[in-house]
Amino acid sequence: MNPVVLTMILLTIMLGTVIVMTTSHWLLVWIGFEMNMLAIIPILMKKYNPRSMEASTKYFLTQATASMLLMLAIVINLIHSGQWSTTNPLDPTTSIIMTLALAMKLGLAPFHFWVPEVTQGIQLSSGLILLTWQKLAPMSILYQISPTINLHLLLLMSLTSILIGGWGGLNQTQLRKIMAYSSIAHMGWMTTIMIYNPTMALLNLTIYIILTTTTFMTFMMSSSTTTLSLSHLWNKMPLLTSAVLMTMLSLGGLPPLSGFSPKWMIIQELTKNNSIIMPTIMAITALLNLFFYMRLAYSTSLTMFPSTNNMKIKWQFNNSKSMNLLSPMIILSTLILPLSPMLALLE
């Protein structure tokens, strides 16, 4: 893709998200979402082939439906209140429709079907944008309307997302699908706490973006798209192998790594609000995610698949890909947990 065109597209994606996050007018929120959706289609189709074409079409149809629902909610809100302001409280009907629209944009269950299919059909760099940056705008609106969200609807979708995100990734060997199911599960954790403590949901989103970015950068650096190709990382980049081990375990939420921090705080917050069954189910289901990440870590770092002698000398050749940005990202994705006591300042 032409660098000038790519720069313009990326700037449009950023501008659309910034408009959604900063405006207080519902029509501008919708326009920001539309800019964001239309600008990312060329990014998804960067490597033109039938799979990326299919993925882009699925993404467009899903997001267009979500935008239609969002506009319906905005119009109903305008009829009831006579105002375009996002600070105005929503009535129950508008809140439910808007929550469903945002759930579709985020990939929450039962609107999660597009996430693994779209992520699998695109490049790793496009998948990184799809699973990180594209979550910012819907989460910011969910944050704004959190006081008026229907509690039971959101908790039902959140718990279903955590369950599906854990079960769906168990039988996968494609790394992009594993990351997609992990994203569904993480979105479930974030939206669970959104009503009780919206600030904690944003903190969870930040840690999720750090962990996912680090993982995708590792995949891109090693050109790995399957479990088998990742298992050959030891002879391409021996230094990166141990980093992959720690990042995978952190993404699975194993203490004392960074990924455990949001789970710990969310379970603590839910318990404070006299919710016992919900965090218990969530904690048990988190073991499913941890299992498939431990399986990835084991196949990458702790075992050696049968290979030819020629493969064992790959590490001697120079690698042109730079690791400058990856080092601080790996540190952030593994060592944030000791800072958790300082987060009491947010309350």
Curated annotation (Swiss-Prot):
Top-level taxon in the UniProt lineage: Eukaryota
Record localization: Mitochondrion inner membrane
One annotated Gene Ontology cellular component of this protein: mitochondrial inner membrane
Catalysed reactions, semicolon-separated: a ubiquinone + NADH + 5 H(+)(in) = a ubiquinol + NAD(+) + 4 H(+)(out)
Example GO BP: mitochondrial electron transport, NADH to ubiquinone
Regions crossing the membrane: 3-23, 25-45, 59-79, 96-116, 122-142, 149-169, 178-198, 200-220, 237-257, 274-294, 325-345
Primary location recorded for the protein, binned into one broad class: mitochondrion
Record flagged with keyword Electron transport: yes
InterPro entries, A to Z: Complex_I_Subunit_2 (IPR050175), NADH_DH_su2_C (IPR010933), NADH_UbQ_OxRdtase_chain2 (IPR003917), ND/Mrp_TM (IPR001750)
E.C. number: 7.1.1.2
Disulfide bonds: none
An MF annotation (GO) of this entry: NADH dehydrogenase (ubiquinone) activity
Keyword annotations: Electron transport, Membrane, Mitochondrion, Mitochondrion inner membrane, NAD, Respiratory chain, Translocase, Transmembrane, Transmembrane helix, Transport, Ubiquinone
Signal peptide: none
UniProt keyword annotation of NAD present: yes
Job description of the protein: Core subunit of the mitochondrial membrane respiratory chain NADH dehydrogenase (Complex I) which catalyzes electron transfer from NADH through the respiratory chain, using ubiquinone as an electron acceptor. Essential for the catalytic activity and assembly of complex I.
Record text on subunit structure and interactions: Core subunit of respiratory chain NADH dehydrogenase (Complex I) which is composed of 45 different subunits. Interacts with TMEM242.
Similarity annotation: Belongs to the complex I subunit 2 family.
Full protein name: NADH-ubiquinone oxidoreductase chain 2
